[in-house]
Regions:
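Zn-dependent metallopeptidase/amidohydrolase metal-coordination segment
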Residues: 7, 12-17, 74-75, 275, ...
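A short beta-alpha structural unit
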Residues: 25-29, 261-269, 280-286, 313-332, ...
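His/Asp/Glu-rich mid-to-C-terminal helical/loop segments that flank catalytic regions of hydrolases
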Residues: 206, 224, 228-253, 300, ...
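N-terminal capping segment at the start of a domain
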Residues: 1-31, 145, 378-379
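A non-catalytic alpha/beta surface segment that caps or lines the substrate-entry region
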Residues: 19-64
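Alpha-helical metal-binding/catalytic segments enriched in His/Glu/Asp
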Residues: 73, 82-123, 212-218, 224-251, ...
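Catalytic-core environment of secreted peptidases
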Residues: 43, 47, 59-90
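Midchain, well-structured core segments that form catalytic/ion-binding scaffolds
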Residues: 121-122, 126-289
Length: 412
């Protein structure tokens, strides 16, 4: 029998174990994260399941079924430093509750195989590489590009992984876990204000935004701030400052979201006109063509502002780029139905943040996500929260989605 209140109790238990007054500290590849994983494994005792870690450190729990075709559910125990009590772990513990219900109902032998995975290092909080375990599973990870990563203390990623039993050079062997995967489902807090503003507890995720992330450098000329007339200046910061306003106009026209997240000036002293200014630009959209327009118009604007200031053409350096991922239309329908059955009303929305589900979909596995409302519209923060009645609805809706998907898998 499904017990959604048990999921909430276990989330609170995990919070007590791995958080303090400043939030959760389950950063991947740390002792606190390992302690959380040991705690989770103890929750499996008495269930007719098999548990193992793959080559990327992803933790797999498998309930064998009459068919080798497998329904996958996933989440992640790792958090950002000072993070919330729900991000990632809700997915996993709700999945565990559904797994318990299936094991009980089918006496340990469901019609299809059901697998639950705790993805390793979704957040990328320590080494700056998000979706590490799931990208190894999907095959998009390039280990040779990650080997030089270090944390703030100078510890190498390769060293931290090895301490946890993972060899960076062998992580792509995790692709073997794709075998027989027929569908992937992921419940997640929304981490934004859309469902809150609509007054709805649950929503269906259409897909994850594509991302264009660039560093833009404007180059001017350093000059004395007291003796250089305003009309004589070649101020790199002025061109960059104009971009801050312009990206709002560009995004209003095309949709999506755009953010200038950092700004560094050189020489960076109060008595000098700025000679060089580098800003970072993050642009996201669910539609690939619209995302391309966002970038194109931002490039045009940067060139125009440079010319207006008498500067050379700005330099654009790509930091990261990822295509939008659209989730499976049939699973979106099932998710809609499941939500309406437990909450009465559903809503479809894209995901701005990236999730492990995007990597699973990238591997060609039919995928969908379900969002539950976030109070305050805030995540990655100790105030992250969701009403308990909404958490219960989320577990119930996930359970219904799982049942619908199992039937669909059998009929394919």
């Amino acid at each position: 029998m499904l017990k959604p209140k048990r999921t909430i109790a276990e989330l609170k238990e995990l919070r007590e174990l791995t958080a303090d007054e400043n939030g959760a500290w389950r950063v991947a590849w740390t002792d606190t994260w390992l302690k959380a994983r040991e705690w989770f494994n103890r929750k499996l005792e008495g269930l007719p399941v098999e548990q193992h870690y793959d080559a990327a450190g992803n933790n797999w729990v498998t309930l064998r079924g009459q068919s080798e075709k497998a329904l996958l559910m996933g989440g992640h125990l790792d958090s950002v430093p000072g993070g919330g009590w729900l991000d990632g772990c809700l997915n996993l513990l709700a999945g565990l509750e559904v797994l318990r219900r299936i094991a009980e109902e089918y006496k340990g032998n469901p019609p299809v195989t059901v697998r639950l995975v705790d993805w390793a290092d979704e957040e990328g909080a320590r080494f700056g590489r998000s979706l590490l375990g799931s990208s190894a599973f999907s095959g998009t990870l390039r280990p040779e590009l990650e080997k030089d990563r270090t944390d703030k203390d100078g510890i190498r990623l390769e060293e931290a992984l090895r301490r946890c039993g993972v060899e960076l050079s062998r992580m792509l062997e995790a692709q073997v876990e794709q075998k027989n995967a027929a569908a992937y489902l992921e419940l997640h807090i929304e981490q934004g204000p859309v469902l809150l503003d609509l007054g709805l507890p649950l929503g269906v995720v259409l897909g994850t935004f594509g991302v264009e992330r660039h560093a833009i450098t404007f180059r001017g000329q350093a000059a004395h701030s007291g003796s250089t007339p305003m009309h004589k200046r070649k101020d790199a910061f002025l061109a960059a400052a104009k971009m801050a306003s312009e990206i709002y106009h560009i995004t209003d026209r095309n949709g999506g979201v755009s953010t200038i997240g950092s700004c560094v000036t050189r020489p960076g002293i109060v008595t000098s006109v700025v000679a060089e200014c580098t800003i970072t630009l993050d642009q996201r959209h669910l539609d690939a063509q619209a995302l391309a327009r966002l970038k194109f118009e931002a490039e045009e604007a940067s060139q125009r502002f440079a010319r207006e200031g008498g500067l050379p053409e700005p330099e654009w350096q790509t930091i990261w780029r990822i295509e939008p991922i659209l989730f499976h239309p049939k699973l979106i329908e099932f998710c809609d139905e499941a939500i309406r059955e437990v909450a009465g009303v559903s809503h479809r929305l894209p995901s701005g943040p990236l999730h492990d589900a995007a990597e699973v979909a990238r591997a060609g596995i039919p995928t969908v996500m379900m969002f539950v409302q976030s109070l305050h519209g805030i995540s990655h923060n100790k105030i992250e929260d969701t009403k308990e009645e909404h958490l219960e609805l989320a577990v119930q809706a996930l359970d219904k989605l799982v049942s619908k998907t199992m039937d669909w898998i059998l009929g394919r």
